[in-house]
Amino acid sequence: MIFTDYRNVDLTNKSLRTVPVALYAHAEDIKSLTLSRNPMLDIPGDFVQLCTSLQELRLSNMSIKKVPQSVQNFTTLMGLDLSSNRIGDINDIALYRLPDLQELRVQNNRMEKLPWYFPRLHLLRLLNISNNKFQDVPEEVCKMSSLEELDISFNMISQLPEDLQSLQRLKILIIVGNRVTRIPDSFRRLSNLGVLDCRRNNITELGAVSLLPNLEELLVGHNSVQALDVSSGPLLKRIDISHNDVTQISLAPGPVGRIPVGLTYLNVSSAKLSSLDDLALGQLTSLEELTLDRNKFRAIPDSLGELSLLRSFSCSDNLIGALPSSIGRLQRLERLDVHNNNLTEFPTALWNCGSLERINMTSNVIAHIRLPSLPPASAAPPPPTLGFPESALSSTVTLVPCLPDRKASTTGSVAPSSRSLPPLVKSLQRLYLGENRLTDDALPLLMILRELRVLNLSFNDFQELPRQFFKEIVLLEELYLSGNKLAGLPTEDLPRLNKLEVLYLNGNRLLTLPQELGKVINLAVLDVGSNGLRYNISNWEFDWNW
């Protein structure tokens, strides 16, 4: 066995039953030693005495039931990992002999209690006892005043003791997957707590936990909370209260009389919300990600347009019939997901979103794609971002026909000129419009989205693609046209699709495939199933006509 670095020795899964002899001569140089996943039951005492500089020892996944006695003699240890074993208790190992121990990981074991001496571990900052058999928070933990991070997840704990308030240095508390029903009022004294993760419990109310002055992240998903009163502290940035029974969100002023405008992330998906307070939403001006999936919304307030920093907005699986026109003011919006709603048309305001890269409007009832209307003649001229030529604008795109038999000289009038393209044209890369009611009238405006990499138009009512459909969208990597009524493909620009890798044409009315398809050099996936393709075995050089 050859070693190149004696400071950090990793012997994971080497089928070792003892420490290699080659390490003895360099034992004093070892800072970190990993012996995980080996059938080793003990560490030789003479080797331990030679390790005068060891700071980290990892003994995880070794199927041990008892901690090797020699571990307590590594007096310079700062981190000890005993996770994922079969340890029932650590009472017979004197860890208090490790005066510098700062991190102890004993998760994924079979422990029910902690040793009496744990409060004597005066420097211990991190303790992970998750996924054991604790029915209560060990009283020893409440006396460990040096703790900064505590993980007691996936035990059988039903109540948090009031004495946890004594952990004044605690910054991270993780209690995921227990049976806790409430957060004690005494938690307001945990003034240094920055992260509280209490997902997957039975919590019905949060109390004043969000008032903590240093709390930055509050994760309460998969509980039974019915109302969220976010009277937040000054540093709160992230709230995840998904998968609860929330029917109301109130954003009341905090202790210093200010609204929690510092929030950057809010997830209230899979709740029971039917509306949002217009004024309250408009106050969350620092939001960057807002997720409202799987609720009962029929409308989104106009104040959505006040969230000028919003990058991601997801409101899928609701009952929304239209998006507010104010969404066009979200110039930093990059991702929009509103699939499985009741949208009847592509929101015209979206054409003004200059950073939008991904739109998912799958499974709606969209029948139209429209451009914004021109302002009245007496009005001030439109801003540069909406300077469409009059010949390209209409209330619907039906006024701009584009048929396969139209000459090339006339197809150029389908789209606005390159100098007046709406901002969305230059940013949109992924567009998902599958399972809607779009017809051929919607195709001209899709043809100008020249930055598209992924376009999904499956399961609509398209019958014929314009002759120059592929002229501008040559950056396509994936194209989905399944489940339409297409009888052919336009061939003029097919060879220019040199980035196309995935093409789905299944479930159409194709009788033949164009020979030009063979010139799409990077095509890796082609699905033409469930068509009427004819194959002539005698005409092998035209093998495309399957």
What role is predicted for each listed range?
Residues 19-22, 43-46, 67-69, 90-93, ...:
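The feature encodes a structural signal of leucine-rich repeats
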Residues 9, 31-35, 55-59, 77-82, ...:
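Conserved hydrophobic beta-strand positions in leucine-rich repeat
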Residues 25-29, 49-53, 72-77, 96-101, ...:
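Leucine-rich repeat
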Residues 205, 217, 226-230, 236-239, ...:
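Leucine-rich repeat domain C-terminal region
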Residues 14, 38, 62, 85, ...:
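Consensus "Asn ladder" position of solenoid repeat domains
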Residues 258, 270-274, 279-280, 291-294, ...:
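Eukaryotic tandem repeat interaction scaffolds
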Residues 97-98, 102, 106-232, 237-249, ...:
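Solenoidal tandem-repeat scaffolds enriched in leucines and small polar residues
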Residues 3-55:
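LRR N-terminal entry segment and analogous cap-like coil->beta motifs
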